[in-house]
Amino acid sequence: MRTTIVRSVVSMVLMMVAGLALADEYEAAIRMFKDADASARFFETSYGYAVFPTVGKGGIGVGGAYGKGRVYAQGRYVGDSSVTQVSLGFQLGGQAFSEIVFFEDERAFREFTSGNFEFGAGAGVVVITAAAQAQATTAGSSATVSGGPNNAETMGNRYNKGMATFIIPKGGLMYEATVSGQKFTYTPRN
């Protein structure tokens, strides 16, 4: 029952943002993160990164999020990834955002690409936004999402256990006080 609800909510959110997808959505997302002061320096210092052009998130009591991405190592596209999230707690609404996870070194890259990787509920995320944003962690506690990378303000930007995660909101409205984490899969490029 919960799985059906989560899938339905995520499907609705993904349909809402389907029009945002472009042929070069990965390049556009990477460009947005390179243009944002908070994340730009990580392109020069990281071993690699995983970029998710659109992650759709929604919930009514039970929530979920899903997005497809690509993984890069030393500037080369090396594989594909997906991110999923299931959350429990008070939540209502839907939102879409772009996400990037930087790998500080080869060890962090190997940890992420070794199979199914998870960020716990307390993992921090830096929100790059032109609008007000209360706080963003995978544990929830967000208020509204709007705007984009223009004139961005951020809250801290450093590696945590070899990884640094940033999101740029695309749109939507999500009220939540939830417990959740993100799970990533990785498939090497053929």
Q: Locations of the language-model features?
A:
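Bacterial N-terminal signal peptides that target proteins for export
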Residues: 1-10
